[in-house]
């Protein structure tokens, strides 16, 4: 299995699953999840800043993580149970987007099409 396929599976199963779980559960999350989301947001922020510097040709992927995903995770993690519902719904949408985007390219790596080959 290629590295790209593993990254896609990671985002489909773990990232998509986590985001959907947090988005649906909202304020009923176990209390330990909020600091976990905060730390995860910081790690994602730092990792994708590093990646945008060493691989600038794919910087747009890193910018999505830097400017959308990590601030959302940090905000939810910091505010905890006081987080407004709209931020959980944004995370829920990000979970579905991750599953859809990475699922599309995972299937495309198995059954190539013109769209997935131009990646």
PLM-predicted stretches and their roles:
Residues 1-119:
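Polytopic alpha-helical membrane-helix bundles and their juxtamembrane interface segments
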